[in-house]
A protein has these predicted regions:
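A membrane-topology feature that recognizes alpha-helical transmembrane segments
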Residues: 1-155
Length: 155
């Protein structure tokens, strides 16, 4: 049995990783939209949709920045929108729950699983593929929620 501190640390890190991928999902949805509209002015940095100012790195921290700024741009004080916050939060929670379902049993049964590395590898592969699938589904969900359609860039 693994120490509770390690388990909590892993679960917190997986929540943070999920929030980061939730932020990525929103950015990717916008990139697909720009690609679908054949717009070329999509830069490398996140910008406010209203004032077009570049968002600083410390205003781009998933969940925390949205809460600190109360869902508004630091420069023009216009609403950012709750979709970004919700995707970060929901993917963070989803990563946490999947980690609880897949990783905690692995950590708690490490001595047994070490005798069967093929089972351990299979369980970890299923876990990673499930996380990747969740990220893709979140990108599609954000795209659908914002524009009421699915991107043709996937076809």
């Amino acid at each position: 049995m693994v120490d509770t501190t390690i388990t909590v640390f892993i679960l917190v890190m997986m929540f943070i990783l999920g929030a980061v991928f939730g932020s990525f999902a929103c950015c990717q949805a916008w990139r697909w939209r720009y690609h679908a509209l054949k717009k070329k002015d999509l830069g490398q940095w996140s910008v406010c949709l209203h004032c077009k100012k570049r968002i600083k790195w410390y205003d781009n921290i998933p969940i925390i920045s949205w809460l600190v700024l109360r869902g508004k741009c630091r420069n023009c004080h216009k609403e950012i929108g709750i979709a970004d916050f919700l995707s970060e939060l929901s993917l963070g929670v989803a990563f946490l729950m999947l980690s609880w379902a897949y990783l905690v049993p692995i950590l708690n049964n490490w001595s047994v699983l070490a005798l069967h590395p093929e089972f351990l590898a299979l369980r970890l592969a299923i876990f990673i593929v499930t996380l990747m699938l969740l990220v893709v589904l979140m990108v599609l969900a954000v795209y659908d929620a914002k524009w009421g359609e699915l991107p043709t860039v996937l076809l």
